Amino acid sequence: MAAAGARLSPGPGSGLRGRPRLCFHPGPPPLLPLLLLFLLLLPPPPLLAGATAAASREPDSPCRLKTVTVSTLPALRESDIGWSGARAGAGAGTGAGAAAAAASPGSPGSAGTAAESRLLLFVRNELPGRIAVQDDLDNTELPFFTLEMSGTAADISLVHWRQQWLENGTLYFHVSMSSSGQLAQATAPTLQEPSEIVEEQMHILHISVMGGLIALLLLLLVFTVALYAQRRWQKRRRIPQKSASTEATHEIHYIPSVLLGPQARESFRSSRLQTHNSVIGVPIRETPILDDYDCEEDEEPPRRANHVSREDEFGSQVTHTLDSLGHPGEEKVDFEKKAAAEATQETVESLMQKFKESFRANTPIEIGQLQPPLRSTSAGKRKRRSKSRGGISFGRAKGTSGSEADDETQLTFYTEQYRSRRRSKGLLKSPVNKTALTLIAVSSCILAMVCGSQMSCPLTVKVTLHVPEHFIADGSSFVVSEGSYLDISDWLNPAKLSLYYQINATSPWVRDLCGQRTTDACEQLCDPETGECSCHEGYAPDPVHRHLCVRSDWGQSEGPWPYTTLERGYDLVTGEQAPEKILRSTFSLGQGLWLPVSKSFVVPPVELSINPLASCKTDVLVTEDPADVREEAMLSTYFETINDLLSSFGPVRDCSRNNGGCTRNFKCVSDRQVDSSGCVCPEELKPMKDGSGCYDHSKGIDCSDGFNGGCEQLCLQQTLPLPYDATSSTIFMFCGCVEEYKLAPDGKSCLMLSDVCEGPKCLKPDSKFNDTLFGEMLHGYNNRTQHVNQGQVFQMTFRENNFIKDFPQLADGLLVIPLPVEEQCRGVLSEPLPDLQLLTGDIRYDEAMGYPMVQQWRVRSNLYRVKLSTITLAAGFTNVLKILTKESSREELLSFIQHYGSHYIAEALYGSELTCIIHFPSKKVQQQLWLQYQKETTELGSKKELKSMPFITYLSGLLTAQMLSDDQLISGVEIRCEEKGRCPSTCHLCRRPGKEQLSPTPVLLEINRVVPLYTLIQDNGTKEAFKSALMSSYWCSGKGDVIDDWCRCDLSAFDANGLPNCSPLLQPVLRLSPTVEPSSTVVSLEWVDVQPAIGTKVSDYILQHKKVDEYTDTDLYTGEFLSFADDLLSGLGTSCVAAGRSHGEVPEVSIYSVIFKCLEPDGLYKFTLYAVDTRGRHSELSTVTLRTACPLVDDNKAEEIADKIYNLYNGYTSGKEQQMAYNTLMEVSASMLFRVQHHYNSHYEKFGDFVWRSEDELGPRKAHLILRRLERVSSHCSSLLRSAYIQSRVETVPYLFCRSEEVRPAGMVWYSILKDTKITCEEKMVSMARNTYGESKGR
């Protein structure tokens, strides 16, 4: 096999390119040694330092970096495969592409596709260093390997690579050490403690020597600076000109591929590979890496010739390239580059053309005849890289040696030997003499040599494979050494492969299960033993892509994206954001999107503009070139929906003839749609399981479900026209029977005609659901709607003798237990409670009477406890369960739930019940009637019927007989009763004349235990799908999926504002606090938290309150808005408003409350409440309109003032007395004035009423000023102020004052969950002053 050519990469990472010389010339500029001294004092990088010191060290000691590029052309040619996409001009700019183009004419299948060129690879690197794959080549370019070797020259010279085409169609590439290196590795001693001690001592010695040298150089530097400060520059001096060029170093390039004639190739193969043994039985080509050379002058050609012949002993084709070290600002070098670039293309094309002609004619070519330009640049077209080639010149090699040189054409590229220099004409006198400069230079060289000897140069080989996309086939293998890895960061389209690692060349291979996951690499964690992926805490595997991780714990970060943070300005001095917004976002709510598997629904802003209010304060101007806008509009196409994008590809079917190829009752649709082949079902129909037609799943069965539609014998199909669309039809499927059989009443099973009995003597067929005793136990139950479904879950059989007293035979599987006698016929009267339904909306509250009250009276009898002992699934339910699979859609499962329910009843209470609700108009009326009932039943003890009479019977008697009391208390009482079942005649508490029944049929009263229907499903996958659909129907309205404790809505479940609404935000019900009745200045409100356990998350409640008077425009006056979370719980509210939170009867239910303590008496107030969720939605409003209690009145003081006014008015009233009476009446409040008038008229009306006397004594003007204040008293308060007695009292009511423990950051949008807010509550006593109104004292 011909040895593949190689080249040294001239990239910037190479340590050979641009290596500075350390060969000094007489009279150097004085600043160069000083600069070199500072560079040497700094710790240099290992590779750069090693290359810098290469001139003054031994050839085998410095660190080297070499890059070799190996073409795969010879191996691919031997495989006799066609390289797809190669054409004559494909490789005009790349050597690999040209070679592929030259090889393609003689290869079969050159017009194949890229997929046909996939190859199996087996890459093995026994040396430390990673393997990288980059699919950065075009399909017309030839794949190649790049070896980047770092280490000493002795180690690099032992590196070998082998490339071979295996018989099984695999391209094998192996990088290893030579036999001596392998032997050294295999026989290395296991215990190296003495050598390590010696190395440590030598290391300490070297550090000491280096420290002394550094101190010496520092002293020389200080001495030089002192001399420089004492000297002065000569008066006549010139500024030196910059050097036009410098001495350049040598670097070696390997040709990517050299095309040889057949005789030379055969002679080379026979002479080179006879002494080598193949590992697998096929000749393996083997190319050693050349050593580097030392620093040498260009004026010594014989030394160069000797070096070249030393390299040629390995039988390789080499090239010496001269690359100058240019300085910034050299105009001549730039000019040379520009001039050389013009002649580059012609020379490269002519060279490649002669290569192709030589290959076709099988004759060698004399490359030395070509006259290339001084420099050339070749840029290979790559997807992600573009490398410039160094300038070269071509000629015949001189002084070659070796047996191979006589048998084949030897191609050697080398650079020119001389470069012109431009000397400086200016002379600058240096203050440092030559002796000091020489000392500094020698010390620098010694220091560099010592530093270089201390550097560790381990041997590493990085193998990079450059291939076209989809070149590597699945099943390829890679082997790396322990500690190395496979780099696929630049592999855009990786293949499935096997990855192994080994400790050394003789150790067994260990499979790296995690590293070989190229197509589905684990995002976070990977188990090295199994290769399975896992996630960090707070993350969970993606449901679809198990190797990816999604957030499972979002903490406080859920909610809309905080775009408002971006809208505000930022002060660099203070480091804070300004409260005013500089920018304004324009949102398009229809383009909202979910963050991937998260709780956040994001509405991105479609435009960002300057806020009009801030435009006057800022100097920001946003402009855009109209030409750019037009060009962008011309070059881009916008599609509103995905269907618009699909429709741009044209029709999917031709529906003009033969229904577009759609079968049966499918309709042909020419428009392209997502997941549609063009054949769709008519509306309200769905395809059959086998896809042969469309049917109505709510009315028929599916004969193609795999279970014969649940039919016992025949499943028949019939095509019927749709009633709402005459052009469409549906396939109706039903069960049938063969001859001598008849369809059973269940519609699916068949009965023999001989066994069918008809007539009055035959057994009655299965009765209907409503006529079956305890039939609810055999049917499904919807736990959300609290209703029993018609779908029968369990089979109703009467094979066992299941009897109970006073009832016919019961169905099998039912266990009926009668309750004890002491629990039968018991009347229960609840405690009187405020009527919550009357504490919301427009409230008519009378502080003299109190809250409206309600009581409940309940009597239960004929009670039975019913349980399911054994269950047998019904045939229809079993057939439906067989149809359901884990792939069943949510719509199918929801249809099942709608028909059969979500649970079945396992235990329930049956019997009869009488429930009566007693509504009292006020708390005062309820208390008086209760006292009256107790008094009469106690005093009339001789009448047994009254003594044992229930309270409900006593009230009913009062309402029936119209035995009204003096104060008409019973007039506002209302009794509403509801009866379930029939009351037995044995219960005197509920029986009614004419409606007694000895053994009434018990009805369902209470469900004690339910079991989900998915427990009846055996398959775990189907069970999980059913559970998911059940959760969706319960919490997400069947339009979304439940994830943790929230709903991810479908794309169709969005409201008009573009926000998800599958989990509706319920309306909170604002009401007066039942435990704290309003006073003249204090009102307490409360509401139940509407946040469900799963679904919508409430972020805040907004409470608005305003005073509504006759003279107030309610539309213009909006009142005051308070945020429950930000204003009340955070403590920002005033002392007049406080927040609280308590729990209801169930601990999971939270009740929020707000107390207002500074309201005006006798004022009409309107309170409004709405909820805000974490996505910015607002619930519907809930309002409470209430007039506060009348102002407090001191009745004793009012009576004293009335007596004082009478005394002033009595007899002759002087001017002083008139003024005193006027001042006294004007100082009191309007309510006190009204009460003074009441007392004056009650006591002294016979001497003239208050109005007439005031006008007579004070005059019309002053009397009008006083009496006009009485108009401010409302009609409600005026009626109460006319009461005979008014007593003042102070009540002390406990109240929970709560405050948030969390401090919210200022200037940030806060979207937290209110229920999760940590608050601390403290119980305090609230004093409330009230007036008690009555006709007599003490009542």
From Swiss-Prot:
InterPro entries in the cross-refs: Annexin-like, ASTN1_2_Fn3, ASTN_1_2_N, ASTN_2_hairpin, Astrotactin, FN3_sf, MACPF
Glycosylation site positions: N168, N770, N783, N1020
Outcome of swapping V1293L: In a breast cancer sample; somatic mutation
Signal peptide boundaries: 1-49
Compartments reported by the entry: Membrane; Perikaryon; Cytoplasm, Cell cortex; Early endosome
Coiled coil: none
Boundaries of every EGF-like domain copy: 510-550, 651-695, 699-751
Membrane-related topology note: Multi-pass membrane protein
GO molecular function: calcium ion binding; inositol 1,3,4,5 tetrakisphosphate binding
Annotated function: Mediates recycling of the neuronal cell adhesion molecule ASTN1 to the anterior pole of the cell membrane in migrating neurons. Promotes ASTN1 internalization and intracellular transport of endocytosed ASTN1. Selectively binds inositol-4,5-bisphosphate, inositol-3,4,5-trisphosphate and inositol-1,3,4,5-tetrakisphosphate, suggesting it is recruited to membranes that contain lipids with a phosphoinositide headgroup.
Protein name: Astrotactin-2
Organism whose genome encodes this protein: Homo sapiens (Human)
Recorded name of the encoding gene: ASTN2
